[in-house]
Amino acid sequence: MEYGIVVYAGEHNRFMCPVTITLPYKSKYKDFRGAIILSKEGEQLAQVERDKGTIHITFLIEEMKRGEKKEFRLKFLEDVSEENGMKLERYNEQIGVLHKGNGLARYNFSRELSKPYIYPLIGPTGVCITDDGPKDHVHHRSLWVAHGDVNGVDVWAEKDDSGRIVHDKFLKLTAGPIYAEIVTKNVWVDNKGRPLLDEIRRIRFWRPTNIGWYLDHEVSLKATYGDIILGDTKEAGMISVRVRKSLTVEEGGRIINSFGGVNEEETWGKRAHWCDYYGTLEGKVVGIAIFDSQENPRHPTYWHVRDYGLMTANIFGLTYFRRGAGMRGDFEILKGREVRFSYRIFIHRGSTIDAKVGERYIDFVYPPKVEVKA
């Protein structure tokens, strides 16, 4: 079975850009385990996933110029080799993410931890780019989620009276030629173990390319047990990163945001669509950028980003970021309601300019348009 696909670059250059096609699920698809995308340039595997009456086909657009149109053929397959794809492997209380047998990241979920987090996070040169529990801030856990005032409970720090984020169960673990995905349920609790709210975390690790790789990170918070106030504090982030010491501004690295702000002086407490942190690691320039989704509350986010290595998307700390403006950043979730925060993390080679971080953000918020023809 084959379909024709037409992809339109639109007003932007595209490079290693994820594209997903959604079709109504039909019984004739039940024996298909994968798909292949054919074009004049060659062929590539696509990832197929079924979900609630639909079927999703995902692949990567290698390169398209502004205004370009490309035609592809989609062919479903009954069998797909997993040799060169993404894989998930369990190591006690960690889920390892691998590509072609090489580790990219590990999701740490032990219930003894203060919070689940991702560490290590391997950069495009094969070296970890994040720090886990540095001495100056032991609660900074590589790539993590936390908030310092949840109905008055500190779920940011790691002290005796701090709250915690506790792993409950995995809802989904899947891997294929294009991405691996972890979906997990966590419960935020106070220091007595009493539940504050429920969290669904969805993390998609995209196949590495020659420019680096993407990680899509989505957090949904539900006020299951009562009304929730996420208080006004700078010690919070629905996505936070702590880079390795050698990447920090203090060691010669740089922070750049979407408005051209440079380093902490021009980016801390400022709003921006994205923020990038890069520097030299073992003789090679690498970086990590966070892209804020346009669908997120209070987009574009404020940034709690420091020359010593912290980068956090924080929409809450307005009394700190907007001193004297009479503004507060408290965020209320009424009982039974849910709020979602989505980000793309771009782990890249080179500087902000070298990696064309701004163009890759456009791929995230304004992806190419796709037509499917039977």
Residue ranges and their predicted role:
Residues 50-64, 291-374:
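Beta-strand-rich recognition/accessory modules
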Residues 83-108:
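An acidic-aromatic substrate-binding cleft motif
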Residues 227, 233-302:
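Active-site/ligand-binding surface loops and adjacent short beta/alpha elements
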Residues 69-78, 184-186, 201, 217, ...:
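Short, hydrophobic/aromatic-enriched beta-strand segments in well-ordered soluble domains
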